[in-house]
Swiss-Prot record:
SUPFAM superfamilies: Acid phosphatase/Vanadium-dependent haloperoxidase. Its EC number is 3.1.3.-. It is an enzyme of class 3 (hydrolase). This is Lipid phosphate phosphatase epsilon 1, chloroplastic. Its main location: plastid. InterPro entries: Dolichyldiphosphatase_PAP2, P_Acid_Pase_2/haloperoxi_sf, P_Acid_Pase_2/haloperoxidase. The gene is LPPE1. The keyword Transmembrane helix applies. It comes from the Eukaryota. Residues 1-88 form a transit peptide. Disruption phenotype: No visible phenotype under normal growth conditions. Signal peptide: none annotated. The chain crosses the membrane at residues 126-142, 164-184, 185-205, 219-239, 255-275.
Amino acid sequence: MAASSSLLLLLHCPTCNFYFDSSSYLKRSRLSSYSSIISRGSPLFVSSFGSMTVKRFSSRVGSRSNDGNEQFGALEQESFINNSSEIRKDLVTGGGIEAIVNRLSKWVVSVLFGSIILLRHDGAALWAVIGSISNSALSVVLKRILNQERPTTTLRSDPGMPSSHAQSISFISVFAVLSVMEWLGTNGVSLFLSGLILALGSYFIRLRVSQKLHTSSQVVVGAIVGSLFCILWYTMWNSLLREAFEASLLVQISVFLFAATFALAFAAYVVLNWFKDER
């Protein structure tokens, strides 16, 4: 009897339990959701024995993925900011805007000088054309005599003392100031225009140094020589040639022919050199 009852008890005890409580069901449902999320990024086979490992791995992968995205976004933003700052630096400090202004300065000054010549259209204007080109020729002669090298950073090998740009710009600026003072006299308007002309000329001259095409001494010497030559040329006209020009037709024709010859020679120089430099 005892043996039969123990046999019944053994047969009655279940060999395995198929009952799932609510907590185990929730845990397994979460495990399946985590495994499905991970399987989207990479094929991963999850077994029931590695539930805790999968949970920890999924949380780590998720956090690393988020951190990686944030770090990648931060690197992109930092790279964009650095590139923008470099572009602004190039535009401001000489690789961009100032380099463009420096290349255009000779055209701006030439247009200003031509406008003054056309507005004056008198003997002094013709005399100024001759003087401006003579001043440029003097600069070339002085460069050959002094034979001072340019800054080592520039690619140009010709002499740099004195600066031809500084000498020409100074001549034209001083002539423009003298013309304004002659037209308007000494008043607030003439002083303002004169200061504006000198400031613009000084800025163009300074660009030769900031662009490392000349040293400071080269542009200073060029500016002094150009200014003194203009004053001397202007004084020579008023004291020696003005009365002769107004009284003699031969002098008028001679000055006109000289000015036309110098102007044509300068135009040929512009075509052969300035446009080549732009290319």
